[in-house]
Each structure stands twice: as structure tokens, then as C-alpha cells.
Amino acid sequence: MTTEFYATPAFPVSKALQWTPPEQLELTPTQADWLLYEGSLTERLKQIGQQFSVKLLGQQLLAPNTEEKQRLKGKDQAVIREVLLYCNEKPWVFARSLFSPSAENANTLNLQQLGNQSLGESLFARSDLYCGDIEVAKVALEHPVARLNQQWFGINQRLLSRRRIFSTGGEQLLVSEVFLQPSPLYSSPNNRS
């Protein structure tokens, strides 16, 4: 995989976003199709991309932002994992996941061993997986992920993101995904982002 062009950002990359129920954003049919997709995003990307890979940006115990802390029931510390999902040798999605340190443990989800493997594949393979409601957000132009998108692809636009809580094995995980410019989410001619 050739990824030298896409310089690795400093970890952690992401900052807080303003999340809302999907019906509060005006989305094109293509945007809604991607943002509200209930299945594994990894599997969907693999179906349309000739090459799929994951690049781990970082995974460590940190303090979540205030809003994330509320969603994680007040936990002061969480393991924060940030990755880029590549299709056809381009980053299509920036993903940020938060979970308790116990979820890294081999006796639960064994997330410490994921490295450059997809969290989605691991989660959606579990029979006890519960998927919470999807929330969406527009990413401001000054957000670090939007700046990366501009740096990498020369396009200065508000990106779209989604997130939800997953529960499995007695653990909760908060997963957010920002769709970058090469992703099909922006292929609609009536793009309103």
C-alpha cells in the first residue's frame, strides 16, 4: 500500500463535535445512505473498494472530552483509539473509538491486540452486539480532521460524521467516523455539506 503522500497526524487528532439526531440535518439520499447504514462500515468499504486497510494513529488511556465523558457515563479515563480506514490507497474515513481499559483485556474484547486491524470486524463478529442509535454531526472547517482533509485532498469543506454506542461482552464502546473527501458519501451532485 502506498500511503507516503498522506502524512500521519499527531495523536490524538479529533476534538469535540456537536452531535444531533439524523433527522435534524438535511442530508442528500447518498449522505443518508452512508451515515445511517446499520451494518459494518468496514464490510461495506471492503465491498466497494479494491483494497482496504487500517492505519492505527494511536491507542492509549486518556481523558475523554466533556461530551464523550457524559456518553460514557462519567468515566474520567478511557482508551482512545484513532485510525484511518483506507480504500484504494486513500484515506476514506477517520475513526475514533473510546472504551474502558477492561475492554483491552483478553478476557473481554482483547482490543489491545487490534493494531492495524478493523475494530468493526471484531465487533460485528460478536453474537451479543447491541448497536445504539446513530447520531450525526457536521465537522467545522477548523476541526483538525477537516484540516487534514484539506491538506490531503485540497478541498476545504465541512465533512460529515456519525457515531453510536456499541455494547458487547459487558463493555460499551463509543465509535465515531468522519467521512473524508474520497469516500462515496460526497459523490452526490447535490452535496449539501
Swiss-Prot record:
Which superkingdom does the taxonomy of this entry point to?
Answer: Bacteria
Catalytic activity as recorded in UniProt: chorismate = 4-hydroxybenzoate + pyruvate
| One biological process term in Gene Ontology | ubiquinone biosynthetic process
List the EC numbers from the record. 4.1.3.40
Where is the major localization of this protein?
A: cytoplasm
Q: Which Pfam family, any one, appears in the UniProt record?
A: Chor_lyase
Give, as in the UniProt entry, the pathway in which the protein acts.
Cofactor biosynthesis; ubiquinone biosynthesis
Show the GO MF annotations: chorismate lyase activity
Which GO CC annotations does the UniProt entry carry? cytosol
Q: What subcellular locations does the record give?
A: Cytoplasm
Which keywords appear in this protein's UniProt record, sorted alphabetically?
A: Cytoplasm, Lyase, Pyruvate, Ubiquinone biosynthesis
Residue sites binding substrate per the record: 81, 119, 177
What this protein is reported to do is described as: Removes the pyruvyl group from chorismate, with concomitant aromatization of the ring, to provide 4-hydroxybenzoate (4HB) for the ubiquinone pathway.
- HAMAP family attached here? UbiC
Family affiliation: Belongs to the UbiC family.
Can you say what this protein is called?
Probable chorismate pyruvate-lyase
Identify the species of origin.
Answer: Idiomarina loihiensis (strain ATCC BAA-735 / DSM 15497 / L2-TR)
